[in-house]
């Protein structure tokens, strides 16, 4: 049995710069990983079978991103003659990241499967090939595959590695799940934030264009942010529902965590520019 980190991410800022004819939104965002997340346990099989041993309530196994990622890797590697005969896996997950939380849990799980099985099966696919497979599963998967903090443009697929300060964060889940389309389909979502260079953006105060909609539509998000903002600069991550406050030290973050109201599910984690998954591979 092998054990593989599947870390969370934060969007340190997120700006919606337009909407394409196909309905997808163009954006500028800054991804950073957390030293906190799910863990995947993978046992290679030799009969070509993929088994997910920890099903998710309400999600058919074949629809789960973990299984879809494994099958896609199997297909691409097989078609290019790089899949050893009988390659398969038993996969289980220790889930800590909430669904619909804006922490990238599902995308991170898919990326960890691609990276881990490519390694365990010895397929030899390049990072670019794995990222291309990942993009077909979700716009956030490639950044997890590449494993470095990044400035993202387009629909999130154009990635430039960056090294923002590695701060400490108090991340709070307000107890609701926000499906991404709920935010992106809202007619009041800002969709015309001017594009700026990464150098300019890094000098500006960070914000998230989705936050105003999430706060308006989900009172729990509004309450969580209102509480966090009493202590430190705080924002929504992704389309929510998680919010986060940033601190210079772990002790400062933990002091605030101790005062968190009971209805708020919160944790402290460090921002890291190299994914914990990729640290394992070094």
UniProtKB/Swiss-Prot annotation:
Pfam families: GHMP_kinases_C (PF08544), GHMP_kinases_N (PF00288)
Any GO BP: isopentenyl diphosphate biosynthetic process, methylerythritol 4-phosphate pathway
Keywords annotated in UniProt: ATP-binding, Isoprene biosynthesis, Kinase, Nucleotide-binding, Transferase
Catalytic activity: 4-CDP-2-C-methyl-D-erythritol + ATP = 4-CDP-2-C-methyl-D-erythritol 2-phosphate + ADP + H(+)
Residues bound to ATP: 98-108
Domain of life the protein comes from: Bacteria
Active site: 9, 140
Enzyme class: transferase
Pathway: Isoprenoid biosynthesis; isopentenyl diphosphate biosynthesis via DXP pathway; isopentenyl diphosphate from 1-deoxy-D-xylulose 5-phosphate: step 3/6
An MF annotation (GO) of this entry: ATP binding
Record-listed E.C. numbers: 2.7.1.148
Alphabetized PANTHER family for the sequence: 4-DIPHOSPHOCYTIDYL-2-C-METHYL-D-ERYTHRITOL KINASE, CHLOROPLASTIC
Family of this protein: Belongs to the GHMP kinase family. IspE subfamily.
Function: Catalyzes the phosphorylation of the position 2 hydroxy group of 4-diphosphocytidyl-2C-methyl-D-erythritol.
Quaternary organization: Homodimer.
Family annotation (HAMAP family): IspE
Protein name, UniProt field: 4-diphosphocytidyl-2-C-methyl-D-erythritol kinase
Upper lineage: Bacteria, Pseudomonadati, Pseudomonadota, Gammaproteobacteria, Enterobacterales
């Amino acid at each position: 049995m092998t054990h593989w980190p599947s870390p969370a991410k934060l969007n340190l800022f997120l700006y919606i710069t337009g909407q394409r004819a196909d309905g997808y939104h163009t954006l500028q965002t800054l991804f950073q990983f957390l030293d906190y997340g799910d863990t995947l346990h993978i046992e290679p099989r030799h009969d070509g079978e993929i088994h997910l041993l920890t099903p998710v309530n309400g999600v058919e196994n074949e629809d789960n991103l973990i299984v879809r990622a494994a099958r896609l890797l199997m297909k691409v590697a097989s078609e290019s003659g790089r899949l050893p005969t009988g390659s398969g896996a038993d996969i289980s997950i220790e889930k800590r990241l909430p669904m619909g939380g804006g922490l990238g849990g599902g995308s991170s799980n898919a990326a960890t499967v691609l990276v881990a099985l490519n390694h365990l099966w010895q397929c030899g696919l390049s990072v670019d090939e794995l990222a291309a497979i990942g993009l077909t599963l979700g716009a956030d998967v490639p950044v997890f595959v590449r494993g470095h903090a990044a400035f993202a443009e387009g629909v999130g697929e154009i990635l430039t590695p960056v090294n923002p300060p590695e701060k400490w964060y108090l991340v709070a889940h307000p107890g609701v799940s926000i499906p991404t389309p709920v935010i992106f389909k809202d007619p009041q979502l800002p969709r015309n934030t001017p594009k700026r260079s990464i150098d300019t953006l890094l000098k500006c105060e960070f914000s998230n264009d989705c936050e105003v909609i999430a706060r308006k539509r989900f009172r729990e998000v509004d309450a969580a942010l209102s509480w966090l903002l009493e202590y430190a600069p705080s924002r929504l991550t992704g389309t929510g529902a998680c919010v986060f406050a940033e601190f210079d030290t772990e002790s400062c973050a933990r002091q605030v965590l101790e005062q968190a109201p009971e209805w708020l599910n919160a944790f402290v984690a460090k921002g890291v520019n190299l994914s914990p998954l990729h640290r394992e591979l070094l």
